Structure formats: C-alpha cells, structure tokens
C-alpha cells in the first residue's frame, strides 16, 4: 500500500473513533436549563458550551467577561 493511502486510512479510523467518543460523552451531558447540582456526589456535566451557573444551579450558556 502506498504511504498516502495508509495515511488516509489512519485518518479515517481516527475520525471514526473520535466521533464515537464525542457522541458517547455528549449522551451523558445535560441540556440548557436543566438542574446541575454542584454538591451532588455524582455530578453530571452540562452540554458544551453550557456551564453550571453558580447562582441558579442550572445549565446556562458560558460567557466570558472581558474588562477594558
């Protein structure tokens, strides 16, 4: 097999593995507005790009505050 074909085959296999991992991780996350109790012994993560809000303990969109 030529080197180019081997590289393509490796990239295809790697992308399939990453996709499988991403869908498995995404299946364990909770959506926007769902309760995300920070004190739970088995915490569940909010789906990307959500974060668990400190004041509401629900999944909210992540924000970045930049001070001028």
Curated annotation (Swiss-Prot):
Disulphide-bonded residues: 29-47, 36-52, 46-59
Keyword list, A-Z: Calcium channel impairing toxin, Disulfide bond, Ion channel impairing toxin, Knottin, Neurotoxin, Secreted, Signal, Toxin, Voltage-gated calcium channel impairing toxin
Transmembrane segments annotated in the record for this chain: none
Main location: secreted
Signal peptide annotation: 1-22
Tissue expression remark: Expressed by the venom gland.
Subcellular localization, as worded in the UniProt entry: Secreted
Single GO MF descriptor: calcium channel regulator activity
Gene Ontology cellular component list: extracellular region
Domain of life: Eukaryota
Function text: Binds reversibly and blocks P/Q-type voltage-gated calcium channels (Cav).
Family: Belongs to the venom Ptu1-like knottin family.
Domain remark text: The presence of a 'disulfide through disulfide knot' structurally defines this protein as a knottin.
Protein name per UniProt: U-reduvitoxin-Pr3a
